């Protein structure tokens, strides 16, 4: 079977902004003002697409309960108000629309709670390159006292911790709301929960949209560690953002 080597034109970088995941309980929902109180000093911004779910706080997985009436799991809503100092959040069913009418506070008995999170990875435009490296540490467990033989003995190791690092370079534009601009700000975000990258090695479209079934990618929650900007009269303005995985990456290299 003939094979085709991939080039950089097959790749892409998608991102979820930092500080865009928060939790709240039934007592944090106010009927009448359509307000939910999540954590303070997150990084939710007006226009951000978000989804709601019920999670088990002890595992981080799916929980048992019912979202406040007016909100549906799997539906994309849009932030119309978030006050960092109080954590007050309002959302609408459409970008720039009016607040969703919340008619009850839902049900979520401990350890269950409600979660709001950025809806999906989004394409970062004007990216010129990205790189990602992973490694594993090894712990030396070599022992002495073995019988000598013809050859020198070899050391023995067991697995230690994994780690990784990456970077992405994007050209700056005059679009205030571009994700490349937001990545710079996210470096200094104290609570980076929600930040994540999806690094496509082979992005494939089907029916006019990206098909993750046919594409190949690496995805992970991330911590942004630094950003470097450069401005010269001879080159396009660019920013390089450095990051590391905050958990085990998911490798999807199978087109099925």
Language-model features: where?
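Extended, low-complexity, turn-rich repeat/linker tracts enriched in Gly/Pro/Ser/Thr and Asp/Glu
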Residues: 58-61, 174-178, 208-209
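Small/polar beta-strand repeat architecture
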Residues: 5-8, 16-153
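Short glycine/proline/serine/threonine-rich loop/turn segments at secondary-structure transition edges
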Residues: 176-192
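Short structured motifs
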Residues: 150-154, 225-228
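Short beta-strand and beta-hairpin "edge-sheet" elements
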Residues: 125-127, 200-253
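Oligomerization/assembly interface segments of phage tail-like spikes and tubes
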Residues: 153-178, 234-250
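Generic short beta-strand segments
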Residues: 50-57, 169-173, 200-204, 225
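Compositionally biased, intrinsically disordered low-complexity segments enriched in polar/Pro/Gly
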Residues: 1-18, 251-256
């Amino acid at each position: 079977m003939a094979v085709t080597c991939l080039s950089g034109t097959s790749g892409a970088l998608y991102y979820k902004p930092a500080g865009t995941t928060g939790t709240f309980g039934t007592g944090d929902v106010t009927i009448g003002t359509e307000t939910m109180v999540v954590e303070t000093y997150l990084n939710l911004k007006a226009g951000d697409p978000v989804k709601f779910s019920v999670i088990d706080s002890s595992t981080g997985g799916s929980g048992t309960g019912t979202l406040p009436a007016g909100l549906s799991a799997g539906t994309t809503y849009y932030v119309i108000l978030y006050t960092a100092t109080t954590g007050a959040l309002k959302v609408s069913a459409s970008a720039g629309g009016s607040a969703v009418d919340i008619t009850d506070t839902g049900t979520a008995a401990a350890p269950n709670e409600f979660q709001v999170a950025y809806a999906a990875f989004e394409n970062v435009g004007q990216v010129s390159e990205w790189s990602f490296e992973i490694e594993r540490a090894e712990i030396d467990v070599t022992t002495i006292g073995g019988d000598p033989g013809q050859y020198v003995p070899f050391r023995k190791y067991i697995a230690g911790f994994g780690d990784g690092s990456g970077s992405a370079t994007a050209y700056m534009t005059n679009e205030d709301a571009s994700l490349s601009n937001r990545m710079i700000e996210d470096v200094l975000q104290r609570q980076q929960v929600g930040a994540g990258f999806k690094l496509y090695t082979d992005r494939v479209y089907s029916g006019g949209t990206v098909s993750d079934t046919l594409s190949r990618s690496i995805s992970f929650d991330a911590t942004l560690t630094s950003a470097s900007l450069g401005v010269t009269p001879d080159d396009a303005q660019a920013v390089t953002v450095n990051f590391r995985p905050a958990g085990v990456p998911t490798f999807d290299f199978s087109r099925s």
